[in-house]
């Protein structure tokens, strides 16, 4: 007979997992699949196999959602599901409405980041609660920023944290920090190390003595983002703020622009600007002022959504100014 303690623990686990009416229906079907008696042996085999497949798929889903519970200190970033049309092998049930997914091909859609399986029509009603599974997120570079931090359950991308820690531990006095380029082949090695080993990647001085390789890897990460750190949607607001002459109005508009960024992007930008502010405190040694860093990071963090090359070219000076303002006013804006 189970103890009172183990029983209360199981009740807590159930409360964590069963968050919706639909999931309650799934649990009922799961219990039926795992424990019901089905009469004759022949009919048992006929009905048992699809139920067993369903039980496995639903149990996997429930376990995944329970184990991916985020640490309370980690912000709960919203992320939309990355649904793609999918052909399922064998019987499958929708994880939203718990109804059978009929058809032989393209029975529904599957989230490429977390593996959620739903009807195409149900996908429009699924909340923005995608919790990417590491088995679906194969790389670090060129991966959507919010997808990466939710998959690894971190506040910021590991690349940003690890590179900045390494740079601040041994490179703040390096002349031309971020302006001087490192050897491109070694920068590519760092990229592959992060894609292969994640947070276990070795970027220490024993592996890469030249700090410019680490700064190059950090800049490459931001350049490779499919959605820039300062997103396409927020881009016009930042450019407009840079054009304002009045300093107070300019900072107020810039603050409003920051609020339009996705939370994971805003947190990463805040952390980066705080780091670049510390870089400017060593300007006598590294010769990198906020203006110089703006020239380097402007085009790296911001990409114009306009296809017109002339319009994008005209924005370069404002991109530089945006980053310069963010660095100088980091303690006020964030």
Curated annotation (Swiss-Prot):
Pfam families: C1_1 (PF00130), RhoGAP (PF00620). Residues 1-10 have a biased composition (Polar residues). The modification Phosphothreonine is found at residues 67, 215. Coiled coil: none annotated. Residues 143-334 form the Rho-GAP domain. Phosphorylated. Phosphorylation is EPHA4 kinase activity-dependent. In neurons in brain regions that are involved in learning and memory processes. GO terms for molecular function: ephrin receptor binding; GTPase activator activity; phorbol ester receptor activity; zinc ion binding. InterPro entries: C1-like_sf, DAG/PE-bd, PE/DAG-bd, Rho-type_GAP, Rho_GTPase_activation_prot, RhoGAP_chimaerin, RhoGAP_dom. It comes from the Eukaryota. A zinc finger (Phorbol-ester/DAG-type) spans 80-130. Residues 1-22 are annotated as: Disordered. PROSITE patterns: RHOGAP (PS50238), ZF_DAG_PE_1 (PS00479), ZF_DAG_PE_2 (PS50081). The record marks 179 as: Arginine finger. Keywords: GTPase activation, Metal-binding, Neurogenesis, Phosphoprotein, Zinc, Zinc-finger. One of its GO terms (biological process) is motor neuron axon guidance. Interacts with EPHA4; effector of EPHA4 in axon guidance linking EPHA4 activation to RAC1 regulation. PANTHER family: CHIMERIN FAMILY MEMBER, N-CHIMAERIN. GTPase-activating protein for p21-rac and a phorbol ester receptor. Involved in the assembly of neuronal locomotor circuits as a direct effector of EPHA4 in axon guidance. This is N-chimaerin. The gene is Chn1.
């Amino acid at each position: 007979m189970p103890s009172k303690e183990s029983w209360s623990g199981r009740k807590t686990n159930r409360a964590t997992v069963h968050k919706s009416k639909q999931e309650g229906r799934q649990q009922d079907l799961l219990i039926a699949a795992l424990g019901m008696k089905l009469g004759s042996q022949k009919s048992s085999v006929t009905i048992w196999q699809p139920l067993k497949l369903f039980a496995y798929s639903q149990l996997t889903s429930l376990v995944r959602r329970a184990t991916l519970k985020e640490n309370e200190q980690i912000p709960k970033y919203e992320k939309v599901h990355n649904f793609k049309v999918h052909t399922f092998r064998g019987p499958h049930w929708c994880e939203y409405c718990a109804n059978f997914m009929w058809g032989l091909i393209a029975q529904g859609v599957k989230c490429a980041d977390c593996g959620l399986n739903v009807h195409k029509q149900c996908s429009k009603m699924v909340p923005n609660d995608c919790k990417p599974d590491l088995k679906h997120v194969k790389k670090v570079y060129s991966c959507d920023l919010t997808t990466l931090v939710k998959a690894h359950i971190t506040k910021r991308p590991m690349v940003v944290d690890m590179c900045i820690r390494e740079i601040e531990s041994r490179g703040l006095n390096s002349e031309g920090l971020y302006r001087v380029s490192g050897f491109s082949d070694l920068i590519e090695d760092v990229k592959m190390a992060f894609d292969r080993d994640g947070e276990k990647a070795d970027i220490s001085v024993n592996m890469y003595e030249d700090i410019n390789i680490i700064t190059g890897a950090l800049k490459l990460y931001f350049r490779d983002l499919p959605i820039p750190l300062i997103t396409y949607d927020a881009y016009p607001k930042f450019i407009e703020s840079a054009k304002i002459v009045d300093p107070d109005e300019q900072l107020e508009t810039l603050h409003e622009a920051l609020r339009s960024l996705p939370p994971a992007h805003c947190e990463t930008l805040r952390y980066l600007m705080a780091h670049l502010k510390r870089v400017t405190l060593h300007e006598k040694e590294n010769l990198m002022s906020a203006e110089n860093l703006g020239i380097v990071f402007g085009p790296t963090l911001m990409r114009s959504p306009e296809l017109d090359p002339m319009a994008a070219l005209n924005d370069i000076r404002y991109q530089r100014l945006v980053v310069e303002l963010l660095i100088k006013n980091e303690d006020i804006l964030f």
